[in-house]
Every structure is written in structure tokens, then in C-alpha cells.
Regions:
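Charged DNA-binding/catalytic regions of mobile-element recombinases
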Residues: 1-210
């Protein structure tokens, strides 16, 4: 009887260790399976309102997708999710607020893609921190300094900022790396040069041989 109890305790201990390892692995991989969405409103020089839809990945703060419209609807928003994640690349979880823009057509498309929606609490933007932080950076580092004439000009500006954010903008949480990781360049590679980005609002620095 005593030996049976010892054997049972050993089995329980092994199972607990395995469960702990699985939980740690799942928690480590969770950010790779979460994306967040949100809208921001941009006013043109003629006071026309344009709505920008953004998709941001929790893993390495990737800026995944954007588009612009003057008339946001559930069908249009659902189409953006399909364009952002083609060919079975959909995430597991989609975090967004309770805006009525996310209507029945949106819910249906997301469910068809196998994505689980996670809704923030009412009036709780801090629960969607990654998307809110990205939108804040986009305003402070880009849109607050540029006059927007129309939808096409806004798309051009956003394209350059998304490229800058993905390839060059550093983050403390990424140990001063960019979302698309950059290799450390040694002094032997040459002198440091600056490459203007986002119309000269920002710069990327690289080493190039003379």
C-alpha cells in the first residue's frame, strides 16, 4: 500500500510538471496569436472626415494592415480582415472595442476565418493598449505634422509611416529593435549614413561602405 501511494504521488508530480511546461509554452506563444484593431478619424484640409482602420499584432508590435474610407461599414471592415490575413494566416484572437461598426457581417466573416473575437469593456480603451499606443504614435509622429488633402494623399502618407514603423522604428520593449528585426551593423561595414523616411519626418541610419 505504501509503495502504491508513493507511485501515485510520483505520477501526480510528473503530470504537474508537464502541465506547467505546457502552460509556459502556451503563454509564450500567445502574443503571436493575438491581433488588435481600431479606427482613428482624420480631418482633411476641407474638413472632410476620413476613417482609418488599423490592424496591429501583439507579437513584436507589428503594423499589419490599414485602409481608409469615408463610410465605414461592417461589410467594408470585414473585408479588411480578409485582406489582412489571406491563405489561412488568420490569428486565433481578435481584440477590438464594442463600436457598432463591427456589425453582423463582420462577426460572420471573422467566425468563418476561425478567429475568436475578444471585446473590451465599455469605455475602456486601455484594454486595447497595443492598438491605442500605435494610433497615438501615428498621430504624434506623423499625422500631427502633415496636411491631408484627400483620401489618396492620406493613403500615401500612411503607407510610408507603416513601412517606417515596421522596418526602422525602435521600441524599448523590443530591446530597441524594430518590429522587423534588424541585424547589428559593426563599424567595419563603413560610415553611418541617414536615410529620410516619412517625407523626412524620420530617418533610418545604416552603415555603408564608402
Amino acid at each position: 500500500m505504501h509503495l502504491e501511494i508513493l507511485a501515485l504521488r510520483h505520477q501526480l508530480a510528473v503530470l504537474q510538471r508537464r502541465k506547467k511546461r505546457v502552460s509556459l509554452v502556451a503563454a509564450d506563444r500567445l502574443p503571436q496569436r493575438i491581433v488588435a484593431t481600431d479606427f482613428l478619424v482624420v480631418r482633411t484640409v476641407s474638413f472632410r472626415l476620413l476613417f482609418v482602420f488599423v490592424v496591429v499584432g501583439h507579437h513584436r508590435r507589428r503594423a499589419i494592415h490599414f485602409n481608409v474610407t469615408a463610410h465605414p461599414m461592417a461589410e467594408w471592415t470585414a473585408r479588411q480582415i480578409a485582406e489582412a490575413f489571406p491563405l489561412g494566416s488568420a490569428p486565433r484572437y481578435l481584440l477590438h472595442d464594442r463600436d457598432c461598426i463591427y456589425g453582423a457581417a463582420f462577426h460572420q466573416r471573422v467566425a468563418e476565418m476561425g478567429i475568436l473575437e475578444v471585446l473590451t469593456a465599455p469605455r475602456s480603451p486601455w484594454q486595447n493598449a497595443y492598438a491605442e499606443r500605435f494610433i497615438g504614435s501615428l498621430r504624434r509622429e506623423c499625422l500631427d505634422h502633415i496636411i491631408i488633402f484627400n483620401e489618396s494623399s492620406l493613403k500615401r502618407i500612411l503607407k510610408t509611416y507603416f513601412e517606417y514603423h515596421q522596418q526602422s522604428r525602435t521600441h524599448l520593449s523590443l530591446e530597441k529593435d524594430a518590429p522587423a528585426s534588424r541585424a547589428v551593423q559593426l563599424p567595419e561595414l563603413g560610415k553611418v549614413i541617414e536615410l529620410p523616411q516619412v517625407g523626412g519626418l524620420h530617418h533610418r541610419y545604416e552603415r555603408r561602405a564608402a
